[in-house]
């Protein structure tokens, strides 16, 4: 609100720094959902990342209370994983007139995954109360409800290679391998759109009766994508203009 406590519509533009927390909950071994298999990858177990994004709002100032609708898009989080597992399948010693040698047969399994988790968009509605301090500085608090869209995608490929390593008694070892056996790629894509709830707080600094500098914080719980929870903490700096 301005110095004259005027009322009227306003627009606001912010640049927000978002701390994003993704938590993956696994069923207890003895729980009722112990046999439920989640299709959400283990990628998203306790991920902490961040992004910077713009946010725009339109609202109405009632001279103390404000109501505003806001919209924001977030950066996509992605990661690659590569793992190798080597398992011994067979071991034997061979002895003949020419000497002895050891054969070891192993299976090498290579697994590669590409995963993304994206808070694609958030459309929110906030109710905010500005505290009149008798100065240009006006702290505020409020509540927010938002319709958010979250996407998750994983693509994985796996191949196996069988190798036989021979260790002669008096010579260098040698390795014989077959052609890699590739399994069919696995791809999964999930999305959810749901209502989430959060809180907002901050301080407005009146530059002119119609222009306010806004430094704010907001917390938002986006809800669940199966058993994956997604939350954001955001710090923002912006300007608000009341008509």
UniProtKB/Swiss-Prot annotation:
Subcellular location: Cell outer membrane
Main location: membrane
ATP-binding among keywords: no
Signal sequence extent: 1
InterPro entries tied to this protein: OMP/PagP_b-brl, Porin_opacity
Pfam family membership, one: Opacity
Highest taxon listed in the record's lineage: Bacteria
GO cellular component, one term: cell outer membrane
Record carries keyword Membrane: yes
Gene3D superfamilies in the record: 2.40.160.20
GO-annotated molecular function: porin activity
Keywords from the UniProt entry: Cell outer membrane, Membrane, Signal, Transmembrane, Transmembrane beta strand
Homology family: Belongs to the opacity porin family.
Functional note: Implicated in a number of adherence functions. OPA proteins are implicated in pathogenesis and are subject to phase variation.
Entry protein name: Opacity protein opA59
Lineage: Bacteria, Pseudomonadati, Pseudomonadota, Betaproteobacteria, Neisseriales
